[in-house]
Amino acid sequence: MIHFTKMHGLGNDFMVVDGVTQNVYFSPEQIKRLADRNFGIGFDQLLLVEPPYDPDLDFHYRIFNADGSEVEQCGNGARCFARFVKSKGLINKQKIKVSTSSGKMTLRLERDGSVTVNMGIPVLEPSRIPFNAKKAEKTYLLQADMPEGMQTFLCGAVSMGNPHCVLEVDDVANADVERIGSLLTKHERFPKGVNVGFMQVVDANHIKLRVYERGAAETLACGSGACAAVAVGQLQGKLARRVRVDLPGGSLTINWEGEGKPLWMTGPAEHVYDGQIQQ
């Protein structure tokens, strides 16, 4: 039997598994079955806690989408990861250092129960996002063949450990997230696919955001997407250093001191239930 915990960060939900004290392996087919909301446990991502590869770190953090693919980053998942390892007694520190497939992260458990995550320095160089463009720009033109014909979108592109494309919209509630997101997420200029954010700027300290996630469709919240949107908005001169991001599942606070500096995200992480499955 494998023990797991169901958690969520603003409705972005996870199956979290301790791979430190348990010997676990999940095939892509198993993950797809477990992610099914009718016949499985149901989740956006599976989070796996593994022993560190570096003695200076506490854990290795792996993320698998509902379609079974492994991805580089998940900000909401990182907050749940921190709460999980502390509550399960895997660590007794407030500050936790982890590695992911895209780098290293610092997670900090706050007194009010929220978690602050150092999401790293936003990557703007196109080849490292990866995004096919000659040079880094604040705004790119992205052409897509829509059912009604060729359409051009203005977007920002950034990596937060995973690739993001951010579009500004006038009214996020009425944005065609499913249709546009499902096309742009596989756009040829993003060789590894892309998460697509739809951002409405309320004022310099407040945005509303919906995200179509690569491999998972639209979710109630996307932490790395919130960070990407704030980075793009700030680079375009529309946002301040501290921004409240309202997502369908709730709000996050993002702090960024500007280019070349790490971006910090603070938000909740909630325990739902503990369970076990047969391997």
From Swiss-Prot:
Protein's name according to its UniProt entry:
Diaminopimelate epimerase
Q: Which superkingdom heads the taxonomic lineage of this protein's source?
A: Bacteria
InterPro entries per UniProt: DAP_epimerase_AS, DAP_epimerase_DapF
Q: Where found, per UniProt?
A: Cytoplasm
Q: Which SUPFAM superfamilies match?
A: Diaminopimelate epimerase-like
What family, per the record? Answer: Belongs to the diaminopimelate epimerase family.
Q: Where is this site: Could be important to modulate the pK values of the two catalytic cysteine residues?
A: H164, E213
Active site residues according to the UniProt entry: C74, C222
One biological process term from GO is: lysine biosynthetic process via diaminopimelate
Q: So where does substrate get bound? A: N12, Q45, N65, G75, N76, N162, N195, E213, R214, G223, S224
Q: Report which reactions are catalysed by this protein.
A: (2S,6S)-2,6-diaminopimelate = meso-2,6-diaminopimelate
**Listed PANTHER family:** DIAMINOPIMELATE EPIMERASE (PTHR31689:SF0), DIAMINOPIMELATE EPIMERASE, CHLOROPLASTIC (PTHR31689)
Q: Which controlled-vocabulary keywords does the entry list?
A: Amino-acid biosynthesis, Cytoplasm, Isomerase, Lysine biosynthesis
Q: In which pathway does it act?
A: Amino-acid biosynthesis; L-lysine biosynthesis via DAP pathway; DL-2,6-diaminopimelate from LL-2,6-diaminopimelate: step 1/1
Q: Which gene encodes it?
A: dapF
- EC assignment: 5.1.1.7
CC annotations in GO: cytosol
Query: GO: which molecular function terms?
Result: diaminopimelate epimerase activity
Please state what class of enzyme this protein is. isomerase
Q: What is the lineage of its organism?
A: Bacteria, Pseudomonadati, Pseudomonadota, Gammaproteobacteria, Alteromonadales
Q: Which organism is it from?
A: Shewanella loihica (strain ATCC BAA-1088 / PV-4)
Q: Does the keyword Hydrolase apply?
A: no
How does this protein assemble?
Homodimer.
Carries keyword Repeat? no
Where are the residues marked Important for dimerization as a site? Y273
